[in-house]
Amino acid sequence: MFTNEEAGSPYGHNNPKNINIEDVDKYTLSDYGLTVDAVKLNHFGVSVTDPRTGEFLPDAFYESKIEAAVSQAEKMLDIVILPRVLTEHHDFYSNDYNSYAFIHTFHKPVLQVEKITLEYGTGTLYRYPTRWWKVYNLPGHLQIMPNTLLSGGSDGLSLAQAYQGNMPVLSGLPASGKNFAPQMFHVEYVGGMLPPSRRGVTAPNEMHPDLWNMIIKLALKEVFEQWGRLIIGAGIANMSIGIDGITQSIDTTQSAMYGGASADIVQLNEDIGKLYTGLKSYYGTNVGLI
């Protein structure tokens, strides 16, 4: 049984350090420009107020819809945005293991990996050396490539020893022809993305400008839905007021089936659809085969 306990930094050219662990929970949506003012700027010229009282839509409403839009975007694209420390257990499959222990993390993008270990039961059997890790940040893929020399470093493990038989020899178990074992791989990493650091330049570990745009438009949809109900009242298509022979008539596109801002919402849906297509291509699609 191998019990490598290699110490030192987990970061290197194959796993760059993008964020300090102690700073992970300090990032907020405002750091990414996802603010109330950003949403209001995108409905410039449209005053979202209650016509009876003149009261503006409160900022708390905008904030809740921004949070909902972020959650919706994460589910649509199968990504995470705010940085977070994640701990996962992955099953052993012989085909994946023979492909340099391929692991597809449950969340993406991956900002940096902290630890990859092999477990059996409740114990750690082997901690993979940092220099073996191959990290593909954007799709959330990890692979392990041992040193190809006869001696793989301080642990004295060679490539032939690391990939012998159908079961991971590193576990200390004999090769038994099994193709599956549950939760043998333990992975700790930081998932999410960082705010843009330079205008006009998109880095893989930073928020894509199209993603920011889509989130704002998702939040804006909720604002326009509320505004459509406020124009003259929910479900009212037209209204007339007469005082001392002076009349005023207001006709809208609103009906019992459609709100007053339906046309704006249709346009937003088209914009969101186009942004989604491009972002889905950028972040990729998670495909699972059984």
Enumerate the predicted regions with their spans.
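Conserved short "hinge" loops at termini or chain/domain junctions
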Residues: 1-213, 217, 226-229, 257-290
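Short conserved catalytic/interaction loops centered on acidic-Pro-aromatic/His motifs
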Residues: 226-242, 246
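Protein-protein interaction interfaces in oligomeric scaffolds
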Residues: 242-262
